[in-house]
Amino acid sequence: MQGISVTGLVKRGWMVRSVFDTIDGIDQLGEQLASVTVTLDKLAAIQPQLVALLPDEIASQQINRELALANYATMSGIYAQTAALIENAAAMGQAFDAAKNDDSFYLPPEAFDNPDFQRGLKLFLSADGKAARMIISHEGDPATPEGISHIDAIKQAAHEAVKGTPMAGAGIYLAGTAATFKDIQDGATYDLLIAGIAALSLILLIMMIITRSLVAALVIVGTVALSLGASFGLSVLVWQHLLGIQLYWIVLALAVILLLAVGSDYNLLLISRFKEEIGAGLNTGIIRAMAGTGGVVTAAGLVFAATMSSFVFSDLRVLGQIGTTIGLGLLFDTLVVRAFMTPSIAVLLGRWFWWPQRVRPRPASRMLRPYGPRPVVRELLLREGNDDPRTQVATHR
């Protein structure tokens, strides 16, 4: 009972403490309300002054409203006038566009009486008034690859500018340094293409007539074209990549002419010797032909190459470039094409090298082959009315 009474007393103490805390909170709330009351008293004192200002503020806002309405009325009229002006301008623009008045301009008659104007008119307009001249200035040197490259862009821009105008079908021509060099370059390229195709076609025809073989003629032309490409590649490597000097445009044209002539000539000589020795068999005939004339053809090619290469010591750089290009082409043609490629192609093709001729891949039988020294045999074979060459050879022996 004593323990229960102590617990009850503790609980009652806590309850009393809670009541006192609540009373303290009410006191604090009262203090805060007192400060709010002070603020409200100050606001109540100011409120009559604010109320007194409201009529003036209302009057000011009414004035602003009237100004806004007046501004709106003014701008409405301006907007209507602007729309009318735009409509008129659009109609006038369409009319001017339909009339194409912008394609010309007006000059007063007095301008044509001016001596200075007449002098300039002769420079920029033709006598009949159907041609006009314009002066274009390059940013760089026109006599350079960069200046020449501007020609196509200028022509394209001029053609684009006259599209949709009465001058759409007019001819546009360019003159000057860059245009002249561009015409020379295009003409040289076109002429070189024609000359190369015509020369190769003519060489092919002549080789077919002489060798009587389509394949052999194609081999000659193909190896000559290969020598041309190799000579130009080696020349570009030496002059432009190693020495840093651009090749002149005429080097290509002159090198083509000489290399076509010399290359086809030497190849024809070698293949003609193949044909002369074909009676001994294809491979044996090639070996004999190379042994008999290979050294002569090689020596001739080396001498010609050395002669042309000596142009490099000339004071004229273009002669040095022409000589070295031809010399490099002859060296490649002599040491690679005629010494290795042409005999190798003939061996690989075999009897098809002489197509459409029919040749024996091996030597003829002893019963079908004449005997005796070569000059005597050739003389007897070419003699007309020869019935039995072997009997005639025996009499010569």
From Swiss-Prot:
Pfam families membership: MMPL
TM region(s), chain numbering: 190-210, 214-234, 242-262, 293-313, 328-348
> Which keywords accompany this UniProt record?
Cell membrane, Membrane, Transmembrane, Transmembrane helix, Transport
What does the record say about its membrane topology? Multi-pass membrane protein
Quote the cellular component terms of the Gene Ontology held in the record.
Answer: plasma membrane
Alphabetical list of InterPro entries matching this protein:
MMPL_dom (IPR004869), Mycobact_MmpL (IPR050545)
Family classification: Belongs to the resistance-nodulation-cell division (RND) (TC 2.A.6) family. MmpL subfamily.
Protein's UniProt name: Probable transport protein MmpL6
The gene name reads mmpL6
